[in-house]
Amino acid sequence: MTKSIIASEPPSAESSGRLPWKILGQTTGFPNQDQELWWLNTAPLLNEFLAECQYDVHLQYQYLTFFRHHVIPVLGPFFAPGTTPNFASRLSKHGHPLDFSVNFQESGATVRMSLGAIGSFAGLQQDPLNQFRAREVLDKLAILYPTVDLQLFKHFESEFGINHADALKVAAKLPKLDRATKMIAIDMLKNGSMTFKVYYMVRSKAAATGLPVHTVLFNAVQRLGSAFEPGLSLLKQFLSPLCDAGETDLGLLSFDCVPTESSRIKLYAIKQVGSLDAIRNLWTLGGTMDDPTTMKGLAVLEHVCELLQFGWSGDSRVQPILFNYEIKKGSTPKPQIYIPLADRYDEFDAAKLKAVFQDLDWKRVPFYQDTGKDLASVL
């Protein structure tokens, strides 16, 4: 669940009180106006997410300090809604390079930030596809946090990287939002540690090679050998015909910054869906997966769709659905489907999601006993 990162106006001192974001902003200072504006327009929201998800004040300071020193400096020039940046991120429809979200699981709620780090020359002739800043950020994180493993990053960087001459040609062809190549996601855990994940958008690489996007993705994972079998073969068998027929758009890959043998790889796709049967087909890989875990997850998904009154009736309700499959060595793919909640009534959805948490007996979710109003604040 995500929320727009740009506030309509900076919060007043009265409404902010002595919140950690306010104190840090007053005491650390900023080297330029861009960083100060990014802080004023994003730190209050991050603070709100952390507080609503029951992070204690010490963790709020810890993660806001990390945000101040390691994220704010790589967001590039500040731009307000309605203005056009030199380089647009895929993280939002407005091209902003930052997104906050909350991951709800039985163990509780985890706040995540996703970052499309912007280089000094991003979108310009020197770096038309903004290929270098994310690499610099990850190299720095690997020094600061020894648990960050860049083995998979180096593999996919060699697979998806584009030389400068080709990058110039590709940038001239692609729309601005399709020029982004990678982003970083950071989970801020309640034990004080962080986990890091990298996302690759490969449309630019496909444009440079002339190969279909799904072929570029599958080839890159296959060159890791058997590290992600049998899941990779099952996905390729199911998704390739859908992609070849133009029915599914597969264009995004992510992985954990941990040793390869421990990492997950996720492949993300979009498909036009007009029925619950189509959702079932995606969830079970066309009916080929019917193990107890898969079918239990499908039952929960159907229940959530019913509670949220997310149904279909006729072609007028056909809409794009984002989904992904997680693969690890020795296991079958694990599906995940994103139910679109944009342009809906947040408090209605919050009340229904609270009912889901209660049905699942997820007592560690912060909003389990709440009215739904607090949950709506992070939708």
Curated annotation (Swiss-Prot):
Q: Provide a Gene Ontology MF annotation, just one.
A: transferase activity, transferring alkyl or aryl (other than methyl) groups
Residue intervals passing through the bilayer: none
User: Knockout: what is the outcome?
Assistant: Leads to the accumulation of aspulvinone E and butyrolactone II.
Where on the tree of life does the source sit, at the highest rank? Eukaryota
Instruction: Note the NCBIfam families from the entry.
Output: arom_pren_DMATS
In UniProt terms, what function does this protein have? Trans-prenyltransferase that acts in both the aspulvinones and butyrolactones pathways. Prenylates aspulvinone E and butyrolactone II to yield repectively aspulvinone H and butyrolactone I.
The identity of this protein, by name, is Trans-prenyltransferase abpB
- The gene designation is abpB
